[in-house]
Amino acid sequence: MSPDGNHSSDPTEFVLAGLPNLNSARVELFSVFLLVYLLNLTGNVLIVGVVRADTRLQTPMYFFLGNLSCLEILLTSVIIPKMLSNFLSRQHTISFAACITQFYFYFFLGASEFLLLAVMSADRYLAICHPLRYPLLMSGAVCFRVALACWVGGLVPVLGPTVAVALLPFCKQGAVVQHFFCDSGPLLRLACTNTKKLEETDFVLASLVIVSSLLITAVSYGLIVLAVLSIPSASGRQKAFSTCTSHLIVVTLFYGSAIFLYVRPSQSGSVDTNWAVTVITTFVTPLLNPFIYALRNEQVKEALKDMFRKVVAGVLGNLLLDKCLSEKAVK
């Protein structure tokens, strides 16, 4: 018996509510979200591949961009495959272990992404404001350590809240999580105990990660603006700003939706609104990232064109070789 008088149990599974207002269009939703997921994977895998393959992109900015694409691939893969399977299933269940795992990786990868976005902002500041010292400050070893710190910085702080949620007493088997994945707020509402302290802890951790990384980003771009405005030529100012525009678009989308969802003590707001904002964070932003960076960056576009030329040339070469070998075999 829980402190508030409700019977608690050790759950073996939950039910994900999904998108109940759109249940009549499950097949259409499956098709749309599958297409979005495949485009997301394709775009981000291309970014990772071209950054590793093209020597022109062996710079700190593109190294961090490759890490960002890896995070986007993992973040969407934590949520979308289960969501797609539920669209085609009558039972929208998820095991307790899978739910807690999804909870952990969603927040771990999200926190790492915030930290990485802040690092990318600081990297742009150093490149624009300290160009002579930049190669020394952002050497390959430094970039590797900073990227590793971003991954570990997301991995460790989320462990405590995840264990705390896993140990909570829940009121009944098969309780409905009012979301399409195991998010913090909907899970805590199913507990048979007072979760106020845990909610406050989640709020503090989310605020620390989001606000601190946002502060680094804001300060970096504030200093960049001051430095760029001091450049006498208009073409010089435009070139300096062009290197930051893509990152600013991504930062605006990501921070705006995350602050709305998690930097609120009570995690209030209508369920439909929270779902809509989560869709932007989980589906739209990762989908747009490769296109934002690729379409606005001449170096990435040229590298992608070269990679496609090599792939096409390789495929045609293999086809011609197979044809020649088959003709010789016939003769």
Swiss-Prot record:
Which residues are noted as glycosylation sites? 6
**Intervals, Extracellular compartment:** 1-29, 81-99, 169-207, 264-274
Q: A Gene Ontology molecular-function term?
A: G protein-coupled receptor activity
User: Any idea where this protein resides?
Assistant: Cell membrane
What the entry lists under Gene3D superfamilies is as follows: Rhodopsin 7-helix transmembrane proteins
Q: Does the keyword Disulfide bond apply?
A: yes
Any Pfam family the entry gives: 7tm_4
Q: Where primarily located?
A: membrane
**Membrane topology type, per the record?**
Multi-pass membrane protein
The transmembrane residues are: 30-50, 60-80, 100-120, 148-168, 208-228, 243-263, 275-295
Cystine links in this protein are 99-182
**Topological region Cytoplasmic:** 51-59, 121-147, 229-242, 296-331
Which GO cellular component term is one of those annotated?
plasma membrane
The alphabetical list of record keywords is:
Cell membrane, Disulfide bond, G-protein coupled receptor, Glycoprotein, Membrane, Olfaction, Receptor, Sensory transduction, Transducer, Transmembrane, Transmembrane helix
Q: What does the record give as the function of this protein?
A: Odorant receptor.
Protein family according to the UniProt entry: Belongs to the G-protein coupled receptor 1 family.
- What protein name does the entry list? Olfactory receptor 6S1
Q: Per the UniProt entry, what species is this protein from, by scientific name? A: Homo sapiens
